[in-house]
C-alpha cells in the first residue's frame, strides 16, 4: 500500500516511456533519404514484376484464344455524358422510330386487351363463366 501511495507522490512511472515514444514519432517524419530511395526502388521493382507477370498471363490467354478460336470480349464504350446520369439513356433517332419502350411492347403482347373497356367487360363476364363451368362439372358428378 505504501508503494501505491508513493507512486502517486513521485509521479507517473510511465511518463518516461511516453516521452521516448513521442521522440520516436518525431524521428519517423524525417526519414533518411537513402531509406526513402530504397523504398521507392523496391516499389518500382514490385510494380515491374507484376507488370511482367500480367504480360505473360495475357500472352497465355491469347494463345488459348487462338487455339480454341475464341474472340476477345470487348466492352462497349459508353458515352461520357452518361457517366453521372441518374435516369435512363436517351433514345437514338432509330430507336425512337422503331417504336419506343421495349417494356411497353412486351406488356401489350402478353394477352391483355389494348383498351380498358374490353378488360372491364371480360372481368364482368368472368363470374358467369365460372358459374356455368362449375354447374357443368357438378352435373357430370354423381354423389352417392
Swiss-Prot record:
Biased amino acid composition, Gly residues: 1-10
Gene Ontology, cellular component aspect: SNARE complex; terminal bouton
Annotated tissue distribution: Expressed in a subset of neurons in the central nervous system, including large serotoninergic Retzius neurons and pressure-sensitive P cells.
UniProt feature, compositional bias: Polar residues: 103-112
Lipid-acceptor residues (S-farnesyl cysteine): 141
CDD domains: Complexin_NTD_CPLX_I_II
Any one Gene Ontology molecular-function term assigned to this protein's record: syntaxin binding
BP GO annotations: regulation of neurotransmitter secretion; synaptic vesicle exocytosis
Topological category with respect to the lipid bilayer: Lipid-anchor
Subunit-structure text: Binds to the SNARE core complex containing SNAP25, synaptobrevin and syntaxin-1.
UniProt protein name: Complexin-1
